[in-house]
């Protein structure tokens, strides 16, 4: 018995370790809300699954061939009580589960601003093949595959795509949302404490999809201001011409920063007045072209 308890404890420890850095290790209010909805839904479903499994084993044991005390009813066909239990419990469970998820989804509406005494930071996000462009309009800078935010400050993300549909997702901050060409999605997130995280593309988008990841750093306010100053002091300018180079298909792009950015660039990308990227090609249509694995500097 002690060995069994030890095995269970080790298994739980390994599972919890595997959750580190993911949606079950939230860093902000939206991430915690997502984790709560997931855990509550799991508990509600287990309340049905576990008794059902236990009853299946009990039925097999109770009505085994060697048990002569078990009641044998060869002509039994209907029981109102059993029908009531079989139908009412699943219906009530679905209603309860739906209510929990609906309330959680309403509270976690991605368009709803987060309440805070600090002013909200705006970051414009563009999904490219196969990299992420982050524009800080108020600071006049941009980065590729690197998102830096001040800890404890709400962030409003305006998200679009210069290629195919994609999904922007930072697991520890919560709520994945579509990046769509010709449209702008809104998402409000917050990192409560300084930390190093990662973000991903959560929808397949072609050859370089598996490498379409980005670094996420939440830092103290002073460090964020110092980082902004460093970026503004060096690096290239991101305008429509340099964006034309950036939008080309490339994978495993290193972290890149731009000291200045065209203030109308994001609007041009979202409205598609600036030409979008080529998008992933169908099999057999590469025409000899290769996907670049280099960066843009």
What do these predicted regions represent?
Residues 1-21:
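N-terminal secretory/membrane targeting signals
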Residues 1-6, 30-51, 85-88:
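Membrane-entry segments of alpha-helical transmembrane domains in multi-pass membrane proteins
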Residues 8, 16, 43-47, 120-122:
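Hydrophobic transmembrane signal anchors and adjacent membrane-proximal interface regions, especially
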Residues 11, 15, 47-54, 88, ...:
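Generic alpha-helical transmembrane segments of integral inner-membrane proteins
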Residues 20-37, 63-297:
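Non-transmembrane, membrane-proximal soluble domains of secreted or membrane proteins
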Residues 42, 51-55, 80, 100:
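Generic alpha-helix structural propensity
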Residues 51-66:
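Membrane-water interface of transmembrane alpha-helices
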């Amino acid at each position: 018995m002690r060995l069994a308890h030890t095995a269970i404890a080790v298994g739980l420890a390994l599972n919890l370790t595997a959750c580190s850095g993911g949606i079950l290790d939230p860093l902000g209010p939206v991430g915690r809300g997502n984790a709560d909805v997931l855990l509550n839904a799991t508990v509600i479903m287990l309340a049905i699954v576990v008794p059902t499994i236990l009853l299946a084993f009990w039925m097999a044991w109770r009505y085994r061939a060697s048990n002569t005390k078990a009641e044998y009813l060869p002509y039994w066909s209907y029981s109102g009580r059993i029908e009531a239990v079989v139908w009412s419990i699943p219906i009530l469970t679905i209603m309860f589960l739906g209510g929990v998820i609906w309330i959680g989804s309403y509270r976690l509406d991605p368009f709803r601003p987060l309440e805070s005494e600090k002013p909200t930071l705006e970051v414009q996000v563009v999904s490219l093949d196969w990299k992420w462009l982050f524009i800080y309009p108020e600071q006049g800078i941009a980065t590729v595959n690197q998102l830096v935010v001040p800890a404890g400050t709400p962030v409003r993300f305006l998200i679009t795509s210069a290629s195919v549909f994609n999904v922007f997702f930072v697991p520890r901050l919560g709520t994945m949302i579509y990046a769509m060409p010709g449209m702008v999605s809104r998402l409000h997130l917050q990192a409560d404490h300084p930390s190093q995280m990662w973000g991903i593309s959560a929808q397949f988008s072609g050859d370089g999809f598996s490498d379409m990841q980005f670094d996420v750093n939440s830092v103290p306010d002073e460090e964020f201001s110092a980082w902004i100053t460093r970026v503004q002091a060096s690096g290239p300018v991101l305008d429509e011409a340099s964006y034309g180079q950036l939008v080309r298909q490339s994978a495993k792009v290193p972290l890149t920063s731009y000291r200045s950015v065209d203030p109308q660039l994001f609007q041009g990308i979202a409205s598609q007045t600036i030409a979008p990227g080529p998008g992933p090609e169908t099999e057999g249509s590469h025409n000899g072209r290769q996907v670049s694995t280099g960066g843009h500097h």
